[in-house]
């Protein structure tokens, strides 16, 4: 007999003991059938008592495909993380700020909730103060994060969990109307995934507000990224199972006041992101940035950069390429550059322009290449290439220029369509 079978048996007994019988007189477990020839559909309602944490983990362990697990209004404390590995389960609270799952007393360093199954919907609750990541899903295709809050209530601290919402290695990822505050890496992070939508969400006081990393096909739109270190990041890194991130559209977002000091633990890639970065594209391809409101980001509104470290991954291209920047609005910003860019500010009278490219065109001794960067903004919008050429930086060869690069048009990726997206 497997350990999981034993756990399910014990958990089922615990749930029945907590809920009593399963008749219609007991609202804790109701059974419904949408049609005679279909499997029974269950709705399990977790009672709001002092055993809430045990009841919830029991329900997650014993869930059947198609179950809905309902959480009541209230604040409930946990000492251990939760996990779900059953397909087609919906976990639904009474609403953001109404159903609050507090992990302030969590033992260990794990995530608050780990999902490793497909076709899962998470909606209508708040996660607070997890020791590790807020909600992580891995290999969870067709997952929906909707109407959720993940936050660390002590403000931006390096001891906070790294990621708020953290889907990885998945296809058809929908993040809709999610709020994240205080993540020490990224508020909303989607990594090594395909076919992604992140929309109508609020990210604030994180290191990175939204990060798309080593992923293919993402639409990031109608979000507000405010008071982070960096608003929206699109990165590609070496030595990961999926390398060659491409085809991201960043549009109709409000990306303002992202001037929080970088509080990422040393060694994290985001620890290098300058405070005051609006949008940053690092080593990614076919990224389209349009229709965004960018305001008061103190370093620069848009940064295009190459990966700086030495690498051995032969699949990897460390340069940002085929990037299109058009039809955005810009105001303020660039007046207090941070990090390595602070060294360049005196060259421009202390003020960096709206769009900054590091000017790296080769790596590890390779010949220079044309990166086809399309800067299609009005002439009044400032731009500079720092003229770095290649990392590590050689100050003697720097060649800054405000002349925009010649470029060919880049076809915009088609809008992302996710079949389980019911609201649009």
Predicted feature residues:
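Extracellular beta-rich repeat passengers
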Residues: 264-412
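Extracellular beta-strand/beta-solenoid scaffold signature
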Residues: 53-57, 79, 103-113, 129-136, ...
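Right-handed parallel beta-helix/beta-spiral solenoid domain characteristic of secreted/periplasmic
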Residues: 45-54, 88-132, 154
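Acidic Gly/Asp/Thr-rich repetitive segments characteristic of extracellular carbohydrate-active
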Residues: 43-70
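Short, T/G/N/S-enriched strand-turn elements that build extracellular solenoid repeat scaffolds
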Residues: 56-62, 77-86, 91, 102, ...
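C-terminal motif of bacterial Sec signal peptides marking the signal peptidase cleavage site
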Residues: 16-18
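Bacterial signal peptide processing site
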Residues: 20-23
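Right-handed parallel beta-helix
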Residues: 94-97, 118-129, 141-154, 171-184, ...
């Amino acid at each position: 007999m497997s350990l999981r079978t034993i756990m399910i048996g014990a958990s089922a007994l615990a749930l029945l003991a907590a809920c009593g019988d399963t008749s219609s007189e007991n609202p804790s477990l109701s059974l419904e059938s949408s049609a005679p020839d279909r499997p029974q559909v269950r709705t399990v309602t977790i009672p709001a008592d002092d055993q809430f944490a045990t009841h919830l983990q029991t329900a997650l362990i014993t869930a059947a495909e198609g179950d809905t697990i309902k959480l009541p209004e209230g604040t409930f404390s946990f000492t251990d993380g939760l996990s779900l590995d059953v397909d087609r389960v919906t976990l639904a609270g009474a609403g953001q700020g109404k159903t609050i799952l507090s992990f302030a007393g969590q033992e260990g360093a794990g995530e608050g909730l780990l999902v490793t199954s497909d076709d899962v919907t998470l909606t209508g609750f708040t996660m607070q103060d997890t020791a590790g990541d807020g909600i992580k899903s891995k290999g969870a295709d067709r997952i929906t994060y909707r109407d959720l809050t993940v936050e660390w209530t002590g403000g931006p601290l390096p001891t906070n969990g790294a990621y708020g919402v953290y889907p990885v290695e998945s296809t058809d990822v929908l993040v809709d109307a999610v709020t994240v505050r205080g993540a020490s890496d990224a508020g909303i992070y989607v990594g090594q995934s395909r076919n992604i939508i992140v929309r109508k969400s609020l990210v604030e006081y994180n290191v990175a507000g939204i990060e798309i990393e080593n992923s293919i096909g993402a639409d990031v739109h109608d979000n507000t990224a405010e008071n982070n270190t960096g608003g929206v990041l699109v990165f590609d890194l070496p030595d990961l199972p999926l390398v060659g991130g491409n085809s991201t559209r960043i549009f109709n977002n409000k990306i303002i006041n992202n001037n929080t000091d970088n509080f990422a633990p040393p060694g994290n890639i985001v620890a290098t992101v300058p405070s005051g970065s609006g949008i940053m594209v690092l080593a990614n391809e076919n990224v389209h940035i349009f229709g965004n409101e960018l305001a008061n980001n103190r370093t620069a509104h848009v940064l295009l950069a190459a990966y700086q470290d030495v690498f051995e991954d032969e699949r990897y291209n460390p340069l940002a390429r085929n990037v299109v920047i058009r039809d955005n609005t810009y105001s303020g910003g660039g007046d207090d550059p941070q990090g390595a860019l602070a060294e360049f500010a005196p060259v421009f009278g202390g003020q960096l322009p709206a769009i900054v490219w590091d000017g790296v065109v080769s790596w590890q001794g390779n010949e220079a290449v044309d990166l086809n960067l399309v800067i299609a903004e009005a002439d009044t919008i400032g731009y500079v290439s720092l003229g770095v050429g290649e990392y590590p930086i050689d100050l003697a060869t720097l060649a800054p220029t405000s002349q925009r690069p010649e470029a060919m048009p880049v076809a915009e990726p088609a809008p992302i369509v996710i079949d389980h997206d019911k609201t649009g």
